[in-house]
Swiss-Prot record:
<keyword id="KW-0699">rRNA-binding</keyword>
<keyword id="KW-0694">RNA-binding</keyword>
<feature type="region of interest" description="Disordered">
    <location>
        <begin position="1"/>
        <end position="32"/>
    </location>
</feature>
<keyword id="KW-0820">tRNA-binding</keyword>
<keyword id="KW-0689">Ribosomal protein</keyword>
<comment type="function">
    <text>Interacts with and stabilizes bases of the 16S rRNA that are involved in tRNA selection in the A site and with the mRNA backbone. Located at the interface of the 30S and 50S subunits, it traverses the body of the 30S subunit contacting proteins on the other side and probably holding the rRNA structure together. The combined cluster of proteins S8, S12 and S17 appears to hold together the shoulder and platform of the 30S subunit.</text>
</comment>
<dbReference type="InterPro" id="IPR005679">
    <property type="entry name" value="Ribosomal_uS12_bac"/>
</dbReference>
<dbReference type="GO" id="GO:0006412">
    <property type="term" value="P:translation"/>
</dbReference>
<comment type="subunit">
    <text>Part of the 30S ribosomal subunit. Contacts proteins S8 and S17. May interact with IF1 in the 30S initiation complex.</text>
</comment>
<dbReference type="InterPro" id="IPR006032">
    <property type="entry name" value="Ribosomal_uS12"/>
</dbReference>
<dbReference type="GO" id="GO:0015935">
    <property type="term" value="C:small ribosomal subunit"/>
</dbReference>
<protein>
    <recommendedName>
        <fullName>Small ribosomal subunit protein uS12</fullName>
    </recommendedName>
</protein>
<dbReference type="GO" id="GO:0003735">
    <property type="term" value="F:structural constituent of ribosome"/>
</dbReference>
<feature type="modified residue" description="3-methylthioaspartic acid">
    <location>
        <position position="89"/>
    </location>
</feature>
<dbReference type="InterPro" id="IPR012340">
    <property type="entry name" value="NA-bd_OB-fold"/>
</dbReference>
<dbReference type="Pfam" id="PF00164">
    <property type="entry name" value="Ribosom_S12_S23"/>
</dbReference>
<keyword id="KW-0488">Methylation</keyword>
Length: 123
């Protein structure tokens, strides 16, 4: 513990928190254009083909974004909405594509957690 004299001389340092989504530039979401849509494999204990897209954002930064849900209609030059949120088993993927916004369709035949996947209520 510092003495009062040390605190008078130096003072307390405030912790600087690291920005987890720098490419969004403080926005909740950003629009972007898909430059490449592909699949990749997750880290060690898991095994799958995760769908991801390389997206050039309106802030002129290119990021890798995860495409959530079962099936998608994205291809090169699709306009997408990107939000923050990392995928734990994909290194370097710190953004997600918003389903049901802009060119991205919602997940078909989805009954639960529909708002997360842009699925409309079935009549």
């Amino acid at each position: 513990m510092p003495t009062i004299q040390q605190l008078v001389r130096k003072g307390r340092k405030t912790k600087v928190s690291k920005n987890k989504t720098p490419a969004l530039k403080g926005s909740p979401q950003r629009r972007g254009v898909c430059t490449r849509v592909y699949t990749t494999t997750p880290k060690k204990p898991n095994s799958a083909l995760r769908k991801v897209a390389r997206v050039r954002l309106s802030s002129q930064i290119e990021v890798t974004a995860y495409i959530p849900g079962v099936g998608h209609n994205l291809q090169e030059h699709s306009i997408v909405l990107v939000r923050g949120g990392r995928v734990k088993d994909l290194p370097g993927v710190r953004y997600r594509i918003v389903r049901g916004a802009l060119d991205t369709q919602g997940v078909r035949n989805r009954k639960q957690a529909r708002s997360r996947y842009g699925a409309k209520k079935e009549k």
